Amino acid sequence: MKSGGIGEILFLCHRIPFPPDRGDKIRSHNLLRKLCEIAPVHVGCFADDARDMSFATELGDISASQKIIPRNNSRVLAGLKGLANGQPMLVALFDHPVMHNWVREILAARPISAVVAYSAQMAHFVPVLEEGKRFVMDFVDLDSAKYTAYGEGQGGPLGWINRREGRVLLDFEKAVAVRANVSTFVSEAEASLFRAVSGLSTGKVRALENGVALDYFSPDAQFERLSPEERGTGPLLVFTGQMDYRPNIEAVDSFARISMPAIRDAHPDARFAIVGRSPTAAVEALASLPGVTVTGAVADVRGWLAAADVVVAPLRIARGIQNKVLEAMAMGRPVVASAQASEGIDVQWDRHLLVASNAGQEAALVLKLLADKQLSADLGKAARARMVERYDWSATLAGVPALIGG
């Protein structure tokens, strides 16, 4: 044991927490490293593809043991299974008998004192625990609210599916939270929302905020800068994110089609770079619009962030704390974000970042920054200072030992 009274830890997460290069993996990776400071950690997780599986060695270097299962469940089949079993589709999509068996074996064979489940779809792998073992449920975001938002005003079968998922998933989340010793969310706003819909107390539902790797995401760090050809000569606006994720897709579509024409009226050479892996066909099609570039996966996002005149985060549906916003601010870049993308981040609007209520205002605020270099520089400097002051991972995860120890 590394800490008095704490045995070993079982950590369950829906994607292998390596490498920390997308939102869900960034949090799970840093949480895992914090848990490893407390006690030996056994990790059960899924791999989306061969690239995920290739990081098994890195995971093995820090875990006491591991179980990585390739995930190939069909969304259609998972949806049908969920309907048949009364499960949320999200849970059915990650169900696997091998993971259930492995969890039971680890609990029987090892002196596990705490089980940490990361994201709602891993909660169903946690059985009823023996007295004295703690169950910490890190929901991260209130996923049911996201599906409810998808379904609002949406007609046809897809609208029905999303509304049904929102209802069933919320019931599941509430049942899990009742069973867990404590449930955590990425921001106090998310935690407060869940307390309101579940009726649970602050002792049962708490905030566990995201952080940012300040040495890595730093304007002074060593990284490859964009070439002059990549950078171009005009104003560069950048969005970063996983580009097969619906909120990101909708965000860049809106900015490219509505905000960019207004910006290019004033700056005909302005470019909008959509930076992130797995762009869908709809995202790739945006590259046909004037001034829009779709990069796909890049080796190091910091080069694009450092080159950006403005980083934009025009999300309309957003839960919790957006890593993309923290990273841009840590790089000292001026950020224009929607209210949804900035919600939950402990900053002052107009001092640390600019916040827009619609696509037209996003364009206006970008143009304001492009016209006032001093304002842009001051905003970036204040953004970096706020990240250093408030969002170092060591500070945001400082309460984890108490959650594990009870």
What are these regions (language model features)?
Residues 324-327, 334-338:
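Short hydrophobic beta-strand element within catalytic cores of glycosyltransferases
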Residues 189, 208-211:
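Carbohydrate-associated surface elements
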Residues 375-389, 399:
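A short, well-ordered alpha-helix in the C-terminal region of glycosyltransferases
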Residues 14, 73-93, 133-174, 192:
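Acceptor-binding helix/loop patch of EC 2.4 sugar-transfer enzymes
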Residues 181, 291, 306-320, 331-334:
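Acidic donor-binding loop of glycosyltransferase active sites
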Residues 353-360, 368-374:
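Conserved acidic donor-binding segment of nucleotide-sugar-dependent glycosyltransferases
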Residues 148-149, 195, 212-228:
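Acidic anion/phosphate-binding donor-loop and adjacent secondary structure
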Residues 65, 267-303:
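Nucleotide-activated donor-binding/catalytic signature segment of Leloir-type glycosyltransferases, i.e.
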